[in-house]
Amino acid sequence: RIHEIRTRFEVLKRDADVDYWRGVAEGGDEASLRQARDTLQATLDDEFAFVAQCNVGGEFLSPDKQARLREIGARRWQRTLDDRIGLSRDELARKPPQAMPLPAEETLLADKPEHRIARPESERIPADNRWGFRMDVPELLYNRGELHNLSISRGTLTAEERYKINEHMVQTIVMLGELPFPRHLRAVPEIAGGHHEKMDGTGYPKRLARDELSPLARMMAIADIFEALTAADRPYKPGKTLSEALSIMAKMRQDQHIDPELFELFLRSGVHHDYAQRFMRAEQVDAVRIEDYL
């Protein structure tokens, strides 16, 4: 949607041109009118560049930057076309019952009621659920508010989007739990569904601590993290080098996110090196000393 917001900036820049020529036609001082137009258009260019950078989410968005975003978003522009035509039935149902009379003044960035998508009761997790899930479920299913999405302090995911991603663990456990595994595979749901748990009990979806997780589930967590960090085929991030991935995982061990004993085994066994040789790109495989990460 950044292109829609860019178009609004274009409208304001065009309005500045119109105001300039109107002022000239009415006998105003051309030099001062030109300076006012050029200053406003330069300001709009700078403000859009800032909004676009917020959309990328490449750095921490401080409270000062969030305040600037709200200030920019408060600029007004005039809409002359009906914003209710051409919508699907569901989208139209989220709109207010009465359309705003045209022309309508809009803010440059908005969090509108129709941006808030309610979460169905069926998608909430009762505290006494039979699987033992302990996850904080956001009130909304989605919040598509423009300021809400641009004001994320770290990254680009809203609380609603992050929950949707994390929810894959819930679905994994629910689905696998319904399958009639033979005796020797009965631990599969726990192994597959526990790789986002942390040793200090702050992970998800059950907030299990180290002693509540099987060794295989703790191994799966290490394998999953290492693969995710080094994967070079993800559209949203480049793959880390071997040394970068191990440095991050060493920090995760210190923070009690992964099992320290199994991480040491992962390093001393050379599994990280074997995996790198088979699955990582040559430019990612740099020299490492395992002693630096123990």
Locations of regions flagged by a protein language model:
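Histidine- and acidic-residue-rich, metal-dependent catalytic cores
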Residues: R1-L294
